[in-house]
Amino acid sequence: MPNDEHLAVLRGGAAAWNAWCAENRGTADLAQAGLRGLDLRGYDLSRADLRGADLRGTNFSGANLSGARLEGANVFKAVFDDADLTGAFLYGAQFLNCAQLGATRNWQSAFRDGDLACGASIPDRPN
């Protein structure tokens, strides 16, 4: 279950969220959150726990998702244009495809399943 405080700050807009993240360097707990269709352009979601979240149609354009955990999240029709996926965990992300990955930055370093090789080597799964 997601942290209610984290959800409230997230819904307050990118400026409020990014300021909160700068002060609270821990992991944002948004696991299993219902974030369907939200506009999260430019949000700093680095290291956020989005495992199992409903992210259908969510706009992550320009967002920082480095080190974020998206395992098992539903990203059907989510937009990732110019999002940073450095070291993101994408194992089991539902409906993720190579076209979505190709629109991002640093996707080659994201930890992902073999069906998302998309012409690049897959980093070894971390312990």
Task: List the model feature ranges, each with a label.
Residues 5-8, 12-127:
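Tandem repeat scaffolds
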